[in-house]
Amino acid sequence: MASYGKASLAKLETCHKEIQAVCFEVIPVFDHTIIWGARGEAEQTRAFEEGFSTKPWPESKHNAVPPGLSDAVDIAPWHTTKPHIRWDATNEFIYLAGHMMQTAAMLGIQLRWGGDWDRDHDLYDINKPFDLGHFERIA
């Protein structure tokens, strides 16, 4: 059974408690790592300037302003062999998203997934840019 390492736990602790609840339910079923929780101004600016985010500071759900808990998390499927993260394994990200979204629904938590921004379950319409590891809380 999979569990989070220290680095993933530290990042997950920066996320809203509802996001944490979903992630803790999914990790024993589908091994994954936490890439980002909350991002400070410098981290968000760098992510935006390098094209890893479409939102400048403080517009991202990763930005907890005032300082608090992030309304977003970025995760990726984790493999025990290298490379541990396989960014081109689209099907694995989609499968992980299914676990995340179903678990959130069972817990009564509303999430939006970066592979289905408009939440219509059609991945091939207007869902650009794809951000398959991104999940954000709908408050």
Name each region found by the language model.
Residues 24-53, 106, 114-118:
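Extended, low-complexity, intrinsically disordered C-terminal regulatory tails
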Residues 60-139:
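Catalytic cores and adjacent binding grooves of peptidoglycan-active enzymes
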Residues 9-15, 43-48, 93-94:
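Charged, low-complexity, helix-prone segments enriched in Lys/Glu/Asp/Gln
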Residues 1-33:
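Active-site acidic/histidine clusters and adjacent loop/turn architecture
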Residues 6-8, 54, 117-118, 136:
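Polar low-complexity intrinsically disordered regions enriched in Ser/Thr and small residues
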Residues 51-62:
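Cytochrome P450 catalytic domain signature, combining two hallmark sequence patches
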